[in-house]
Amino acid sequence: KLIVDEIEDIRVIASGSSSFDLLNKAGEPLVGRSTLFHLTPFSQKEIAPTETTLETRQNLESRLIYGSYPEVVTLDSFERKTDYLRDIVGAYLLKDILAIDGLKNSGKMKDLLRLIAFQLGSEVSYDELGKQLGMSKNTVEKYLDLLSKVFVVYRLGAYARNLRKEVTKAGKWYFYDNGIRNAIIGNFNPLSIRQDVGALWENYLISERIKANYNEGLGKEFYFWRTYDRQEIDLVEESSESLTALEFKWGNKKTNVP
């Protein structure tokens, strides 16, 4: 604040891996004088100028398994990518995040992340997660709120025109980066022997849409949609001008539109 107030025509860039921690330390004194940018892992649109269409196709499996953190994209072997992601999960997720809010139970945080990772794209409620983990609903909500603020996971609510229902219905949880998700469950196996390829594909594409929203300032809101008879659409994008529905499938099988 002192620098901005005292030095004319200066721009200060404050960055950090946690928006929560950064805003607590620098945000309030700079209200009205700052612009906030969300820097996610690389989007495919950012990577595209550096590779051919053929290379993009060849690298798709790596993106689904190892994700798109800048360091991961540039590392030259799967072994080094794996080691890097394990380091992030071990050193950052289970230490730095807990320190941000004075939390102490790293075991419960890890169990919650693993549960979310294994239920990728499935509807879950705070109550349900709490019962499975032996935690209170409020503790689960607090942990997931913190994980959202540090850009590890994000929640999609159900699309409904009743705003109360949008907030209270069970939601779906996704990871900003596939590599982090796979590191949490310790699975870097190739797609040919995995049972979760569809979930990885869905997580990857929805995250790409979220990244575009941040990077291009589109101002969209994101939901999923489901009827009482279990018909479902993976992603609903709402802007001030339009409503767009997207369904993501891995493979060539034709599906019926709900």
Regions found by a protein language model. Name each.
Residues 4-28, 147:
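Sensor-1/coupling segment of RecA-like P-loop NTPase cores
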Residues 127-131:
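A short acidic, leucine-rich amphipathic alpha-helix
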Residues 17-125:
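Interdomain motor-coupling "hinge/lid" segment immediately C-terminal to the ATP-binding subdomain
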Residues 145-152, 157-258:
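A cross-kingdom feature that marks ATP-driven nucleic-acid transaction machinery
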